[in-house]
Amino acid sequence: MDSFVNISIELLKGFCENLKLFSLTLLFSVPAGLLVMFCSISKFKPLKWLSKTFVWIIRGTPLMLQLFVVLYVPGLLFNTPIKVRFTAALIAFVINYACYFSEIYRGGIESVPVGQTEAGQVLGMTKSQIFFRVTLLQVIKRILAPMGNEVMTLIKDTSLANVIANKEIIMMAKEYSAKGLIWPLFSTALFFLVFVGAMTLLFNWLEKKLSYFR
């Protein structure tokens, strides 16, 4: 019988895999979301509608399905399979969350009154000056809450990587439960609760720091 300490260490190693997926997804999907957003508001209509269609497809299909597509389709169509399961999971997560973040960005930008942009133009400011000096900080304040919600969802969604055999904490807990041990499942819940709680405190602090925009 595995000892409590040994199992806890193994679960911690599994959760580190979740944290790695979470961190890298944020690192790549936040700027990728900006790129998708700029495409979706582009005045070049083919690019705009291509971007909107792509976002619609990604947001309208389950992340679990997207994981399978990323893992298997390259090998089936191009004979170039993705051999590392973590890499496949990361690609699927980045694509998925970039699309969700792009919609949050777009909503934040569109919520800033047009009059402020027009006032900047009257003052002779360039588009980039208007964006960085007038729009950006207001957008950050407006999108902070929905971004926080997506980040919380991402933390929990990392557990979906186990469906393509990426060995994270949920997969390990299931392996131990198959041996008749139920407590690793509750320990897994505790890992997620602590991390989500920490991120909640962080976003609450950020919202208070930006409350002067109210």
Question: Would you name each region that the model predicts?
Answer:
Residues 1-214:
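Transmembrane alpha-helices and adjacent helix-loop boundaries
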